[in-house]
Amino acid sequence: MKGEALKIIEEVLAQGRTAMVEYEAKQVLKAYGLPVPEEKLAKTLDEALKYAEEIGYPVAMKLMSPQILHKSDAKVVMLNIKSPEELKKKWEEIHENARKYRPDAEIFGVLIAPMLKPGREVIIGVTEDPQFGHAIMFGLGGIFVEILKDVTFRIIPITEKDARKMITEIKAYPILAGARGEEPADIEAIVDMLLKVSKLVDDLKDYIKEMDLNPVFVYRKGEGAVVVDARIILKG
């Protein structure tokens, strides 16, 4: 767990970087048993075609570059690619968009990912307070975080009881619990993720400055959750 994650962190720091690309961040999460999609990093078009075939169409493509952390601004995320022909076209387009956005961008490759079925969007974040150390944050994604600031915080490490309270304390909890005849979300999967993030950060507190799992798709009770996008900033 820790050894595997540390190896990735040390490689990033050795390159003089503190911002991990999404692929690296997800590898760290995966080392701690967090649910990430079955994605593969393609360095060539041939690899991209091979991985898309293995994963099964439709797929998503995301260009990985340490200079392009806001991928949607740079138009380097392509969704719902349905065929090899379309993938070839999008491969050219995604690289062209990256060059326009940051001509000096170093490109690590393109992440080929399955198209995920949408779930309830939640966000899990970590920040470091100079006085109290690392804190973990939880809330519903989108408007709830951005506009309503409906989030809860706890100092790391957290207990299972803390994780459950973090979830029930948000104002939007009824949405997760299954208000108005909606199917309840998989609360146990969220509890598990909060505990695993807490353990990860507690183990690696000397290295991690902040972390953002946004969005996380949470499915119906018993169906789990998956980290759709992730960002980790390391201490320099």
UniProtKB/Swiss-Prot annotation:
Q: Which InterPro entries match?
A: Acyl-CoA_Synth/Transferase (IPR051538), ATP-grasp (IPR011761), ATP_grasp_subdomain_1 (IPR013815)
Q: Pfam families from the entry?
A: ATP-grasp_5
Write the Enzyme Commission number(s) for this entry: 6.2.1.13
Function summary: Catalyzes the reversible formation of acetate and ATP from acetyl-CoA by using ADP and phosphate. Can use other substrates such as phenylacetyl-CoA, indoleacetyl-CoA and isobutyryl-CoA, but not succinyl-CoA. Seems to be involved primarily in the degradation of aryl-CoA esters to the corresponding acids. Participates in the conversion of acetyl-CoA to acetate and in the degradation of branched-chain amino acids via branched-chain-acyl-CoA esters.
- Swiss-Prot/TrEMBL keywords: ATP-binding, Ligase, Nucleotide-binding
For this entry, the protein name equals Acetate--CoA ligase [ADP-forming] II subunit beta
Q: What GO MF annotations does this protein's record show?
A: acetate-CoA ligase (ADP-forming) activity; ATP binding; metal ion binding
Q: Report whether Transmembrane helix shows up as a keyword of the record.
A: no
Q: Which reaction does it catalyse?
A: acetate + ATP + CoA = acetyl-CoA + ADP + phosphate
Organism this protein belongs to: Pyrococcus furiosus (strain ATCC 43587 / DSM 3638 / JCM 8422 / Vc1)
Q: How does activity depend on pH?
A: Optimum pH is 9.0 (at 80 degrees Celsius).
What is the enzyme's main class?
ligase
What taxonomic classification does the UniProt entry list for its organism? Archaea, Methanobacteriati, Methanobacteriota, Thermococci, Thermococcales
Which family is this sequence assigned to? Answer: Belongs to the acetate CoA ligase beta subunit family.
User: Which PROSITE patterns does its entry note?
Assistant: ATP_GRASP
- ATP-grasp domain: residues covered: 26-62
Gene3D superfamilies named among the record's database cross-references:
ATP-grasp fold, A domain, ATP-grasp fold, B domain
Which residues participate in ATP binding? 52-63
Keyword Membrane on this protein?
no
Per UniProt, subunit arrangement is: Heterotetramer of two alpha and two beta subunits.
Temperature dependence is: Optimum temperature is above 90 degrees Celsius (at pH 8.0).
